[in-house]
Amino acid sequence: MLDHPLNSLGFAKPPAVTRVVVAMSGGVDSSVVAAELAAEGYDVVGVTLQLYDHGAALAKKGACCAGRDIHDARRVAETMGFPHYVLDYENTFREAVIDEFADAYLAGATPVPCIRCNERVKFKDLLQTAKDLDADCMATGHYIQRKMGPAGPELHSAADPARDQSYFLFSTTPEQLAFLRFPLGHLASKAETRALAARHGLPVADKPDSQDICFVPNGNYAEVIQKLRPGAADPGEIVDLSGRVLGEHRGVIHYTIGQRRGLGIGGLGDPLYVVRLDPERRQVIVGPKEALSTRIVPVREINWLGDAPLTSRSEWQVMAKVRSTRAPREAVIRPLSDTEAEVELIAPEDGVSPGQACVFYAPGDSRILGGGWIWRGAR
């Protein structure tokens, strides 16, 4: 069984008259959420979004919300006996996620499209659809926890650090959090999720996990960008910090901050890393590893989840995470407005890149205090 909140979902009425829309990607996580809720007697409605043309070149096997996954979600619904609907969100997804993804790379940034998808599609349009279906709440298969605090629902990291998805969900607003449920957040491991899937006889119990960037075939994001923005891979110069030309690159979109391999400028002594991208000059700037060291990070579009307003203090002591694969580090937030701040990392980080998220956590706690987008000018 899932944890106690799922037995009631926080509503003072029987499960049979509590409608829950489950966002079903076709993977094992959201399938288990739907199956557990259905088994507990809730009025479950499964919804899967078709986010792109799964017959076109952008689709790939094992990608979230592609043709196979829609089929798998439907099979789970049939197994558990609840209705399932497929909604065509291709245009919305392209406008809200894919176009910005391509434009960000053209601007020399390294975007995180999964965050934008949660923010602009799943927790916006799909959540509104759930309300239109008279649902009491919407449940997803994300590994994150929703806990009740003194001021209302709070967002907390998942119990399993290896599966925690809080970095990708920092932009969840208090209003959205009031309507959302995350039944898997308390589980200790993915093995528990698969065991629940097997217990329910779900056809996806052994299905491999999907890739993060669902619309990028084989991880070749540059190929996708070139299809969306012809001419995006114009070659240019690789230069060092003094401006000396060291070689030629294949297009700025092929490079990210901190990259060392694949530069094609070997034999120059000490290893060189990409420290900056200048798309206007079509330059890739490289330097020694110490040139990547960053302590001051400008952050904008902040979604603040603390109980007191962000600007109520001149400084906030937090733990900050500047990449999804890195652990949170000690930091100080210095607000500039309700949505902008300067974040000082107590210990420098390498490879801080525009387009990534900077997510804030309460010191000594699992609570997510919000986050924002890293902007140019990190130093």
Swiss-Prot record:
- Which cellular compartments is it found in? Cytoplasm
Output the SUPFAM superfamilies linked to this UniProt entry: Adenine nucleotide alpha hydrolases-like
* Source taxon at top rank: Bacteria
Which stretches of sequence are listed as region Interaction with tRNA? 163-165
Q: What is its EC number?
A: 2.8.1.13
Q: What is its main location?
A: cytoplasm
The chemistry this enzyme catalyses reads: S-sulfanyl-L-cysteinyl-[protein] + uridine(34) in tRNA + AH2 + ATP = 2-thiouridine(34) in tRNA + L-cysteinyl-[protein] + A + AMP + diphosphate + H(+)
GO biological process terms, alphabetically, are: tRNA wobble position uridine thiolation
CDD domains hit by this protein:
MnmA_TRMU-like (cd01998)
Family the UniProt entry places it in: Belongs to the MnmA/TRMU family.
What is this protein identified as? tRNA-specific 2-thiouridylase MnmA
Species of origin reads Cereibacter sphaeroides (strain ATCC 17023 / DSM 158 / JCM 6121 / CCUG 31486 / LMG 2827 / NBRC 12203 / NCIMB 8253 / ATH 2.4.1.) (Rhodobacter sphaeroides)
Encoding gene (name): mnmA
